[in-house]
Amino acid sequence: MLRVVVLGAAAGGGVPQWNCGCPVCRKARSENPELRSTQASIAVSADGAHWYLINASPDLRQQLIATPQLHPESGHLRHSPIAGVILTNGEIDAVAGLLSMREGSPFMLYAHERVLAILRSNSIFNVLGENNVKRQPIEADKAFEPALPDGSQSGIEILPFAVPGKGAWYLEGKAHPTGGDAAGDTLGLRILDKGSGKYFYFLAACARVTDDLKSRLAGAALVFFDGTVWRDDELIVQGLGTKTGQGMGHISMSGEHGAIESLAGLDIARKMFLHINNSNPALLSGSDERKQLEQAGWQIPADGTEITL
């Protein structure tokens, strides 16, 4: 049995963003606190005692406090049920939370070599001493089983695979430690319970849906998918930014080649959007965009949502 907890569903900066006065952020601060969301991450466990984080968001400390499943056991001076962290990219949204895990509890860190190279190139991540935090490279299309703290099997198999995307934005125009944008900068994950054979997919970033990706996702029990923007130019139209969704490596929810249309008809039992930007009108309950999303069988999960497979 797999247990999955949504720690956060928002894109960079969360909802509300600290300096934003857009309609969504204004409502989240005042009359609609249910709109508030921390930055995208999930936790998964096969035994309910040992958990693996998928990405470590900048809001991680707040997320851990809000999630009883991830609290330390009583009777220990230092303890954490977190056995490991799996990174799907090197964006700030995915790695900054690692700095909140520097108090000496051991855990495994799994990431593509290109992402590990980013961490090595920035000495601030040296606070994660390698005696306590072992770094394990992972490869696209090569399944692995993350280890429990005692070295035994976790019962979870993770298959990383490359998806269309881009490198971290803070490296734009700069030399990547291992070269320019390439496969490995953005990964999707298939996460499988070896006992039951149940599995789900996690894609917090994806620039487009390819035929290969459709084949992977078809028939899945659950898919978490990139929901950053409703339409490609919404940041520009709303005066919130200068980049399109595609320019940031993110597909739109709507439109002819958007996620909703591209993933329709694939017999996915449960579809959830994650990494949703504050500019996205689908966040507003009752909006036309939200109605279209829900009519197509999609959900936007609240922080703390738990799903069992």
Residue ranges and their predicted role:
Residues 53-57, 82-91, 111-112, 201-206, ...:
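Active-site neighborhood of phospho(di)ester-bond hydrolases with catalytic His/Asp-centered motifs
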Residues 80, 90, 131, 154-156, ...:
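Structured loop/turn residues at beta-strand edges in well-structured enzyme cores
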